[in-house]
């Protein structure tokens, strides 16, 4: 069965393994999430469940949001994500999914929004080498030529140029679940995940995990 949770990144710390190795981990408050919708192949063309995370005051939600969550009977939520799975029979509306759904040693993919760093040049954004620093080059951090002249008379798509750095959807794959604290709904993941503290992330079974 496919597993997944919406969570909140709390920050990074370190723990020690039994053999004395120091492991850098990210602490994620994973769930509890509530199943608010089920999708089927017959009706929607694919099989999935939609889960909600983070309670929201119903007075601050519009009628569409309240009506959407009415079937689950668990109030309104701040964040919603879809989790595709082969079979949704194990879930029904209103079911609560908690951190205990994952076990130590599981491999997961984590999707979040990277930290926005504003407008950046090509050296910081793309790792360009830059030009000479001396001898009158007058070409230090500039991008250089961005294309030809008469032919093709345009700049090609996806040309690496200055612009917004960060603040985009990023997925980190094959992170190991180092520890699960079911009582407090905490999951410790080996390594770093996208985003800043208190950022919302989606944790799912790794698509590249060995079967």
UniProtKB/Swiss-Prot annotation:
GO terms for molecular function: rRNA binding; structural constituent of ribosome. GO terms for biological process: translation. InterPro entries: Ribosomal_uL3, Ribosomal_uL3_bac/org-type, Ribosomal_uL3_CS, Transl_B-barrel_sf. Keywords: Ribonucleoprotein, Ribosomal protein, RNA-binding, rRNA-binding. One of its GO terms (cellular component) is cytosolic large ribosomal subunit. PANTHER family: 50S RIBOSOMAL PROTEIN L3, LARGE RIBOSOMAL SUBUNIT PROTEIN UL3C. One of the primary rRNA binding proteins, it binds directly near the 3'-end of the 23S rRNA, where it nucleates assembly of the 50S subunit. Belongs to the universal ribosomal protein uL3 family. HAMAP family: Ribosomal_uL3_B. Part of the 50S ribosomal subunit. Forms a cluster with proteins L14 and L19. This is Large ribosomal subunit protein uL3. It comes from Citrifermentans bemidjiense (strain ATCC BAA-1014 / DSM 16622 / JCM 12645 / Bem).
